[in-house]
UniProtKB/Swiss-Prot annotation:
It catalyses: Endohydrolysis of (1->4)-beta-D-xylosidic linkages in xylans. The GH10 domain binds to xylan. It is an enzyme of class 3 (hydrolase). Binds to and hydrolyzes insoluble and soluble xylan substrates. This is Endo-1,4-beta-xylanase 5-like. GO terms for molecular function: endo-1,4-beta-xylanase activity.
C-alpha cells in the first residue's frame, strides 16, 4: 500500500496498550512555554493513570522497536484501531524524536475506515532530544481510525514516548475553555476604602464601568461604509477595531504608476477615528503575483521593481505612521513569492526591516491563511509560519522589531477541528509574540453560527491570542460569506452570535456594596474583572460629600493579591 501523501511518509503506530475514555484529566489547555518550545533530554513522566490511549518507548536504551517509514513509503505494521464517536473532541499528544536528522517535521495522522486521512498536528523533531507533538481530531463520523506518524523524511525512524489520546465531550471542552478564560482574561482585584487614619469606611458603594477592553473582537470594513449611513451606525455601535479589506492595498491606492490616491482609505480612517475605532493596516505589500497593480505586473526589470516597491513602502507607511495598530507587511509570503523571484530570497525580510525603520512602534505581522483552519495545509503550516517569523527577526537590524502573527482564519463550511486549532496556536504562541485572527469567515452553511462561535471561543480561550477580526458585515456591505445582518440591519443567526460574544467579552458595569459591619477595622471587597481600562467611583449612600473617582487599568500582570487602596479625606 503506497503511503506517500504530499511528500510525507506515513508510519502506523503499533499500540501495545490503549484505552480511550471521557474526562478532563489530560490537559491540552496547558500552555507551558517551556514544554512548547524546549527539546528535552528526557520527557516528563505523565501524571495520567487512566482514560488514555498510551504507548511509550523505553528511555533506558535503544533496543526497543521504532516506527520505521519505509524508503518506498509503504506501511509496514498493522495497528490496533481506536473507535471515535461523532460529537466528541479528541486531543493527542506525544513526545517524539528521530533516530537520524534534525529539525524535521513529524506529524500525527488519523486514517478513517474509507481511507480518508485527517492530519492532526505537527512539530519539528530532532535526534538528540524529545519534542512535544500536540494535536487532535473532531470527527464528523462515528467509527474506527488508525493512527499514524508522518514525516517529511523518507526512511525516517521515529521514537515516541507518552503517546496519549483523550476524549472530551463538547461540554467538557467548553468547561475547560471557560476555566482558562477566567484565568487568562481576568484578574482578581480587591478594593480597600479607608479614612486617612486608616480606619475602614463602612457601607461604601464602588461603581465600576469598563471604558476599554484589552481584548478586541473587531470586524473588517470596505468602501461601502462611506455610502451607507445604516452601515456606519451598525458598525460604530459594535466594534472598536477594524481593518480595510482592500482600500489600503497597493492596487487600490496606485492604479496607475505615480498616481497615488488615498482618498477612500483616508475617508474610512477618518470615520474610524471619529468613532474611536482602531485600525489594523492591511496590507503594505502582497506576495501574490496576481495581486500586484496591473502596471507593476508589466515591469520586467528587477531594479525597476525594487524602485517602485520601495516607493510604495515609504508612501503608505509614512502616510499612516502612528495611526495604525499594526501592519501586514508582506501578505501571504509563504504561499507566494513574487518579490523573492523578482528581487531575491531576502526580499520579504528586508522589507520588514524597512518597515521597522519607518515605524518602529507598530506591530509588523506575518499574515497567512490555512495555518489554523486547514489541517491539510502544506505550505503555511504553524511550524513554517513560526520559522518565517524567526527568519525575519534574525535579519540584521530586526532584533527589536515588534513582530506578530496573523492567522487569517478562512474556514470551510464544516465542523472546525478545535483540538488542531489549539495545537496550532500553541506552536505559533511559542514565539512569545501576539497572535491575531485577522480575517475570520466561513461560507454559508446550516451550522455556520455554531461553527463560528466554536472558532471564536477557541481563540479567545488561548493566552497567545490578543484579538480577532472577522470579515463580515450587514448585507449592504457585500460580505457574501459572513452576513451578520439583513438589508434592514436585522441580525442573522451568526450576527446574534457576534453580538452575544461582544457583550460577554465586555465587563458589565457593576456596583460593589461593601458590608455594613462595625466590628472590622479593614474591609476589602474582591471582584474578578476582565482586563482593560475602568472608571471607578467610590461613594456613600448617605454621606453626600464622600465621593471620589479614578481610572484603573486591570492587566494580566497584576498580582493576584492586588489591593486597590482608596483613601477618603474626612
Amino acid at each position: 500500500m503506497n503511503s506517500i501523501k504530499n511528500g510525507f511518509f506515513l508510519c502506523m503506530i503499533f499500540l501495545l496498550w490503549c484505552h480511550v475514555d471521557s474526562g478532563v484529566s489530560i490537559d491540552p489547555f496547558s500552555h507551558s512555554h517551556s514544554l512548547n518550545t524546549e527539546c528535552v533530554m528526557k520527557p516528563p513522566r505523565s501524571s495520567e493513570t487512566k482514560g488514555l490511549l498510551q504507548f511509550s518507548r523505553s528511555l533506558e536504551d535503544d533496543s526497543d522497536e521504532e516506527w520505521k517509514i519505509d524508503g518506498n513509503g509503504f506501511i509496514r505494521e498493522m495497528a490496533q484501531r481506536i473507535q471515535l464517536h461523532q460529537g466528541n473532541i479528541y486531543s493527542f499528544s506525544a513526545w517524539v524524536k528521530l533516530r537520524e536528522g534534525n529539525d524535521k517535521k513529524v506529524g500525527v495522522v488519523f486514517r478513517t475506515e474509507n481511507g480518508r486521512l485527517v492530519h492532526g498536528g505537527e512539530v519539528r523533531a530532532n535526534q538528540e532530544c524529545w519534542t512535544l507533538l500536540k494535536g487532535g481530531i473532531v470527527p464528523d463520523f462515528s467509527g474506527p481510525v488508525d493512527i499514524f506518524f508522518e514525516s517529511e523524511n523518507r526512511g525516517a525512524k521515529i521514537s515516541a514516548h507518552n503517546v496519549l489520546l483523550k476524549q472530551f465531550s463538547k461540554e467538557e471542552w467548553k468547561l475547560k475553555q471557560d476555566q482558562l478564560i477566567e484565568k487568562i482574561r481576568k484578574s482578581k482585584v480587591r478594593f480597600e476604602v479607608t479614612y486617612e487614619n486608616k480606619t475602614a469606611v463602612k457601607g461604601v458603594v464602588i461603581s465600576l464601568k469598563q471604558t476599554k477592553s484589552s481584548f478586541l473582537l473587531g470586524c473588517g470594513m470596505n468602501f461601502r461604509i462611506l455610502q451607507s449611513q445604516g452601515y456606519r451606525k451598525w458598525f460604530a455601535s459594535r466594534f472598536k477595531i477594524t481593518s480595510f479589506t482592500n482600500e489600503m492595498k497597493w492596487y487600490a491606492t496606485e492604479k496607475a504608476r505615480g498616481q497615488e490616491n488615498y482618498t477612500v482609505a483616508d475617508s474610512m480612517l477618518k470615520f474610524a477615528e471619529d468613532n474611536g475605532i482602531l485600525v489594523r493596516g492591511h496590507t503594505v505589500l502582497w506576495d501574490n503575483p496576481k495581486m500586484q497593480p496591473s502596471w507593476v505586473k508589466n515591469i520586467k526589470d528587477p531594479n525597476d521593481v525594487m524602485n517602485v516597491t520601495l516607493n510604495r513602502i515609504n508612501s503608505v507607511m509614512k502616510r499612516y505612521k502612528g495611526k495604525l495598530t499594526g501592519w501586514d507587511v508582506v501578505n501571504e509570503n509563504l504561499h507566494w513569492d513574487y518579490f523573492e523571484k523578482m528581487l531575491g530570497a531576502n526580499a520579504s525580510t528586508s522589507f520588514y526591516n524597512l518597515a521597522f525603520k519607518i515605524d518602529p512602534d507598530v506591530r509588523l505581522f506575518v499574515n497567512e491563511y490555512n495555518t489554523i483552519e486547514n489541517t491539510k495545509e502544506f505550505t503555511a503550516t504553524p511550524i513554517k509560519v513560526k520559522k518565517m517569523m524567526e527568519e525575519i527577526l534574525a535579519y540584521p537590524g530586526n532584533k527589536n522589531m515588534k513582530g506578530a502573527i496573523g492567522a487569517q482564519g478562512h474556514f470551510g463550511p464544516t465542523q472546525p477541528n478545535l483540538a488542531y486549532i489549539r495545537s496550532a496556536l500553541d506552536t505559533l504562541g511559542s514565539l512569545g509574540l501576539p497572535i491575531w485572527l485577522t480575517e475570520v469567515d466561513m461560507p454559508k452553511c446550516p451550522n455556520q453560527a455554531q461553527y463560528v462561535e466554536d472558532i471564536l471561543r477557541e481563540a479567545y480561550s488561548h493566552p497567545a491570542v490578543k484579538g480577532i477580526i472577522i470579515f463580515g458585515g450587514p448585507e449592504v456591505s457585500g460580505f457574501d460569506k459572513l452576513t451578520l445582518a439583513d438589508k434592514d440591519f436585522n441580525n442573522t443567526q451568526t450576527g446574534d452570535v457576534i453580538d452575544k460574544l461582544l457583550k460577554e467579552w465586555q465587563q458589565k458595569s457593576s456596583e460593589i456594596q461593601t458590608n455594613f459591619t462595625a466590628d472590622s477595622d479593614n474591609e476589602e471587597e474582591e471582584v474578578s474583572l476582565l482586563h482593560g481600562h475602568y472608571n471607578v467611583n467610590v461613594s456613600h449612600p448617605w454621606i453626600a460629600n464622600l465621593s471620589t473617582s479614578f481610572s484603573l487599568e486591570v492587566t494580566k500582570e497584576m498580582d493576584q493579591d492586588q489591593v486597590i487602596r482608596v483613601v477618603i479625606s474626612a
